[in-house]
């Protein structure tokens, strides 16, 4: 049975929109990682820069100081480690420590050395769709064009296709209506040769789905609905805050999909 990968979010920042300040010391971060592993996480995604709306950019030195001690403490755990960064210097420092994956929220567009660094360490990379929101073509077409172009550049740099993930970038450079369009057409991204990761957890899109004002934590069940929808559309991984809820749901959806496929093969 094909298992949907669960990526647990570990923000080691003071200002992330959902859990800023909770895990920005090594001891609390270690405890959170252990809990997420027990809850079913396949990947831990460590981020040292908040990308919430209105965030302030932190220096390279500050990002290093936030991320490296945590990565060094958890890299030996029995789980894949990803680092959420768009800076090749941070990526290389973490890859030297043994992380498995870089989650680049600018898909190599911010730092053109990123692909060479990831290829050098034979690691995986996630390319997330981003931008300034100004586009000359419909959102899905622009997303596909941009991500496939960057994936091609990643391959030229030496990263094999099976180590390149695509993320449609829900919550970034899109209106709520554009995000709904992207969700409805996820299968077009899945139809590419690359595995797809979906990251909707507690974002404003899930608030819109609720139809009324909510705190980020109150959006977990609706996040799980997007997980189920994404898996049915063919995504291979989901990036979430509430690992236990989404891991259980993904296990159930995976089973039902496998059962459906088996019945089709018999007919």
From Swiss-Prot:
Alphabetical list of PROSITE patterns matching this protein: DHPS_1, PTERIN_BINDING
Top-rank taxon: Bacteria
UniProtKB keywords: Folate biosynthesis, Magnesium, Metal-binding, Transferase
Gene Ontology biological process terms, A to Z: folic acid biosynthetic process; tetrahydrofolate biosynthetic process
Catalytic activity: (7,8-dihydropterin-6-yl)methyl diphosphate + 4-aminobenzoate = 7,8-dihydropteroate + diphosphate
Top-tier EC class: transferase
Pterin-binding domain: residues covered: 1-251
Sites where the protein binds Mg(2+): 11
Cofactor(s), by name: Mg(2+)
Annotated binding of (7,8-dihydropterin-6-yl)methyl diphosphate, by residue: 84, 103, 167, 203, 239-241
Pathway membership: Cofactor biosynthesis; tetrahydrofolate biosynthesis; 7,8-dihydrofolate from 2-amino-4-hydroxy-6-hydroxymethyl-7,8-dihydropteridine diphosphate and 4-aminobenzoate: step 1/2
Keyword rRNA-binding: no
Subunit structure: Homodimer.
Protein name: Dihydropteroate synthase
Origin organism lineage: Bacteria, Bacillati, Bacillota, Bacilli, Bacillales
């Amino acid at each position: 049975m094909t298992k949907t990968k669960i990526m647990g979010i570990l923000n080691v920042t003071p200002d992330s929109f959902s859990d800023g300040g909770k895990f920005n010391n090594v001891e609390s971060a270690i405890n959170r990682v252990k809990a997420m592993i027990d809850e079913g996480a396949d990947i831990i995604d460590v981020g040292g820069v908040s990308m919430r709306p209105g965030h302030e950019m932190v220096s390279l030195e500050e990002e290093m100081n936030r991320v490296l001690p945590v990565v060094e403490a958890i890299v030996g755990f029995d789980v894949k480690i990803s680092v959420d960064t768009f800076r090749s210097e941070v990526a290389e420092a973490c890859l030297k420590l043994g992380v498995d994956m870089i989650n680049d929220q600018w898909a190599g567009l911010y730092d053109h050395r990123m692909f060479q660094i990831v290829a050098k360490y034979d690691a995986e990379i996630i390319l997330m769709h981003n931008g300034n929101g100004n586009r000359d073509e419909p959102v899905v077409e622009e997303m596909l064009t941009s991500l496939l172009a960057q994936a091609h550049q990643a391959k030229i740099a030496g990263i094999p296709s099976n180590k390149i993930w695509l993320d449609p970038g829900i919550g970034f450079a899109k209106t709520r209506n554009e995000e709904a369009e992207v969700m409805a057409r996820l299968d077009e991204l899945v139809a590419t040769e690359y595995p797809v990761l979906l990251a909707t957890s507690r974002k404003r899109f899930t608030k819109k789905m609720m139809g009324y004002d909510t705190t980020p934590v109150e959006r977990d069940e609706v996040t799980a609905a997007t997980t189920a929808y994404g898996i049915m559309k063919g995504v291979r991984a989901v990036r979430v805050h509430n690992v236990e809820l989404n891991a259980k749901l993904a296990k159930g959806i995976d089973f039902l999909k496998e059962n459906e496929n088996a019945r089709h093969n018999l007919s």
